[in-house]
Regions:
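Immunoglobulin-like IPT/TIG beta-sandwich domains and homologous Ig-like subdomains
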Residues: 1-58, 86-149
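Short beta-strand elements
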Residues: 59-76, 149-170
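Short beta-strand segments of immunoglobulin-like
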Residues: 78-86
Length: 170
């Protein structure tokens, strides 16, 4: 069909957004990308997704069935290493997209350790975490917002590879 539009609804934030379908869309699938300029309009969370399109020889749009989709946080800036202070605390500042909204729960996972952020004002796309009395070592870092973890695998590569989201705590 033509005039394909992807409809996204996030009930928690009472959001309804539309994104033009593009890419290699075909009769059996649709591809779309949230435009970078609009990333903050799509908070991390679960979305109900449908496609609206006009079928050949028809003038009224039809809507597909609805499917679930998750938008995950993406770490955009992470220090390669941080030094612990005299108490064994490591301060880690990160940047990410999309912005954290008021009411969302957030933590930084460092290996098996979950660290809560220092105080912040939402919306924000940067946070500081202090891993208290933490051990030295090279840790895999993930950002968790409302139970959704930032990806650690780059599935655009063949074969898939791990993102280099590690922090060396000294």
């Amino acid at each position: 069909g033509s005039n394909r539009t992807v409809l996204l609804r996030n009930e928690r934030f009472d959001l309804e957004q539309q994104v033009a379908a593009g890419g290699a869309s075909a009769a059996d699938h649709v591809e779309f990308t949230v435009p970078a300029a609009r990333a903050d309009e799509f908070p991390v969370g679960t979305y109900d997704v449908a496609v609206e399109l006009i079928m050949p020889d028809e003038s009224d749009p039809r809507q597909s069935n609805h499917l679930g989709m998750v938008i995950a946080p993406n770490i955009t800036s992470l220090p390669a290493s941080v030094a612990r202070d005299g108490n064994g605390d490591a301060q880690i500042s990160i940047s990410f997209t999309p912005e954290l909204r008021a009411g969302q729960q957030v933590s930084l996972l460092l290996g098996n350790e979950e660290v809560l952020p220092e105080s912040f004002t939402a919306p924000t796309s940067t946070l500081t975490f202090i891993a208290r009395d933490t051990e030295a070592g090279n840790r895999l870092a993930r950002l968790r917002i409302d139970g959704v973890d930032s990806p650690i695998v780059d599935r655009s590569m063949d074969p898939p590879t791990f993102f280099n989201l590690r922090i060396d705590i000294t």
